[in-house]
């Protein structure tokens, strides 16, 4: 209740601040593209257009949500916190949150959308790879409970929160998509909460005697490994797609300056005299 009483005025202040934001300037629209609501047909076309990329992100996010829910719901069974204050969990999460806020906040100073997207995916890949490494090597590393919890939380939440905050905003701006982040956030949340339901069902109906630390390390190790591959492939796709669209844009600019009609097929133009 104390936390809620402290957070409520801040939430109200932030909500009021959002209503006072100025309208986007022409430069803002040029850098980030205009944001409009998509209908069903447009959402389908957008998904098909970026399907390989989005499928990788959605599937990886599902696994991250399942791992996050297991960590939060079964944490007291996973690690031994005897002798530690009950505030230790909150302190670890606070430090993790501040680090992530600093990392994501620093992206404001980077104007290039593709650089931000690559940097974010790079952070995510680093996080999932580190999570997998410390999970598979838990016995040899011999980390204490607090260090293990801190590293696991930092790696997991960097990957999870990236797609709940700034990633899709920069994605829309980078590829000049006529839409908004609502479609992406709602879709990724829907898929993620499907994983949450599975975890809750497991919690209610599974009564097996499980070594939770061993189970979690195995699960986080494989989730980290799969997500590392998925996000690396996503980053490669993103870079290649951006280069391709940049080439198409240059060809269209050449069309305008040279009086040539761009066909978009094979990068071969057709002159107006041939029409």
Question: Locations of the language-model features?
Answer:
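Short amphipathic helix-loop junctions that connect adjacent transmembrane helices
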Residues: 70-87
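A late C-terminal transmembrane helix in Major Facilitator Superfamily
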Residues: 174-207
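Conserved extracellular-gate-facing transmembrane-helix segments in secondary transporters
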Residues: 63-71
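Intracellular loop-helix junctions on the cytosolic face of multi-pass helical membrane proteins
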Residues: 1-57, 72, 81, 110-112, ...
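A membrane-interface helix-boundary motif in multi-pass transporters
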Residues: 1-6, 201-229
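Transmembrane alpha-helices of Major Facilitator/SLC transporters
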Residues: 85-113, 127
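C-terminal transmembrane helical hairpin of 12-TM major facilitator-type secondary transporters
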Residues: 115-161
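Intracellular juxtamembrane helix-capping segments at the cytosolic ends
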Residues: 75, 159-175
């Amino acid at each position: 209740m104390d936390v809620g009483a402290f957070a409520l005025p801040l939430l109200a202040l932030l909500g009021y601040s959002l209503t006072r934001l100025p309208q986007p300037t022409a430069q803002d629209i040029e850098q980030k593209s205009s944001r409009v609501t998509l209908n069903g047909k447009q959402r389908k076309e957008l998904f098909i257009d970026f399907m390989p990329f989005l499928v990788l992100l959605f599937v990886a996010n599902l696994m991250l949500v399942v791992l996050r829910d297991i960590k939060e719901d079964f944490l007291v069974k996973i690690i031994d916190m005897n002798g530690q204050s009950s505030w230790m969990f909150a302190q670890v999460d606070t430090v993790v949150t501040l680090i992530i806020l600093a990392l994501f906040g620093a992206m404001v100073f980077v104007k290039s959308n593709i650089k931000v997207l690559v940097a974010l995916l790079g952070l995510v890949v680093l996080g999932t790879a580190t999570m997998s490494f410390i999970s598979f090597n838990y016995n040899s590393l011999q980390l204490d409970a607090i260090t293990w919890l801190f590293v696991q939380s930092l790696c997991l939440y960097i990957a999870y929160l990236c797609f709940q905050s700034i990633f899709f905003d920069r994605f829309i701006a980078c590829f000049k998509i006529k839409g908004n982040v609502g479609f992406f956030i709602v879709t990724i949340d829907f898929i993620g909460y499907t994983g949450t339901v599975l975890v809750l069902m497991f919690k209610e109906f599974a009564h097996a005697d499980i070594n939770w630390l061993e189970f979690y390390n195995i699960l986080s190790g494989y989730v980290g490994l799969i997500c590392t591959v998925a996000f690396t492939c996503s980053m490669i796709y993103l870079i290649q797609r951006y280069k391709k669209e940049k080439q198409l844009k240059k060809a269209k600019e050449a069309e305008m300056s040279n009086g040539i009609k761009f066909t978009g097929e094979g990068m071969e133009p057709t002159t107006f005299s041939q029409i």
